[in-house]
Amino acid sequence: MAAPELKGTRVTVVGLAKSGVAAARLCAREGARVTVTDRRGEAALGGALAALPASVTRRLGGHDAADFTGADLVVASPGVPLANPEIQAARRRGVPVWGEVELAARFLGGLPIVGITGTNGKSTTTALTGALLARHRRTFVGGNLGTPLSELVLSGEPAAAAVVELSSFQLEGIERFRARVAAVLNVTPDHLDRYPDVDAYAAAKARLFATQEPDDVAVANARDPRALAMAGASRGDLHTFGFGAPVPASARDEGGEPGPGGTAIWYTPRGRAPERYQLHNRALRGRHNRENAMAAVLCARLMGVPGEAVQAGLDAFPGLHHRLELVAEGRGVEWVNDSKATNVDSTFVGLAAFPAGAPRVVLIMGGRGKKAPYAPLRPLFGGRVKALLTIGEDAPAIERELGDLAPTEPCGDLPGAVRRAAVLSGPGDVVLLSPACASYDQFASYEERGEAFRRLATEQAR
């Protein structure tokens, strides 16, 4: 795929989040006459504006239709729906509309790319796959995970491969972007404020496979019918992973949990003996993370990473911040930060990562609720939850729906909950922050909430 000739062309970049800024910088570097436009005003965009070259024209607080219909190219940030009236007007005029990923990919030539999508688990699987590949070759890791793909082009740094997390929003804007290995982890209803139904949401994700060639590889969760169907439409070779997934060329696990004793992942190459990879790493605890690890092992081996490098990468993977992250340990108590669990489904997965039996989890929940019931968590409380500590705006609802299942105390805020957790926990226990709520009632973001928990837990663990 030849790099586009942008010198002297009129490019409009819509949306000034990280990917929009990176796209604008790349187009300006290539000599385009760049206009950026965002409905937000200057006060809300200070940091983004400061990162733009002086040559870039800024259109803030709204859009001018002429910037779209008069452009040679429109680059839309992932947060901008392609149903936007100005974007539709540009398309009617024959103006190409790309996403930032599409723009960047056109400058990357034949760089082998692993593209990973799915409703849940994308970030962990992308980071783990990147860590495994990095033990074999110089690898860029980014996309929706944090660093826009355009930053790789701008950096000029050599890379032998890229592992890119791709959201449905990003995949809407691809035309020729091609993943050497394309993986879909799962598909469940999400972003239905942007898509009319789950079929439209799945169709956006399926675009990842539509651009593959016969010598590419499609990877799918064998137990997810939507994922399997979309990957099966690829012109590439289909490989599967999952619990009890069939051979040939599959990855599956043998049960158990990471930690002492551990579990293992089996990879079965076509025509060769199965390979066994030990999974001891507590950063990958939980059934969902075992599934993520299966996908990562499969992608890495299909990209030619040697088996010994895969095992070393699994052992060393530190996990991602705020996702079942062990942040402190002391007096025999583990303190686990799952602040990224901003909805009930995520807390369900987090709590299920701990074995049932004698109740050992002191659970901190609460924040700004999302008008979803907490009752789906009830089956997990028995044999797991030693005490429930509530914080934030939705504490009364949590107490009402779950408070009969374990000793429950309203604590008001996170510092109060952590102090109380230190009193209630003992050797062998886990203090788990898994809020099932957004953070905005008391924190600016789930990251800020997680960092606050890290500091407070570290103090208590001393």
Swiss-Prot record:
Enzyme class name: ligase
Pathway as given in its UniProt record: Cell wall biogenesis; peptidoglycan biosynthesis
A family per Pfam: MurD-like_N
Entries under InterPro entries matching the protein: Mur-like_cat_sf (IPR036565), Mur_ligase_C (IPR004101), Mur_ligase_C_dom_sf (IPR036615), Mur_ligase_cen (IPR013221), MurD (IPR005762)
Residues given in the record as ATP binding sites: 118-124
Any one GO molecular-function label of the UniProt entry: ATP binding
Official protein name in the record: UDP-N-acetylmuramoylalanine--D-glutamate ligase
Biological source species: Anaeromyxobacter dehalogenans (strain 2CP-C)
Lineage: Bacteria, Pseudomonadati, Myxococcota, Myxococcia, Myxococcales
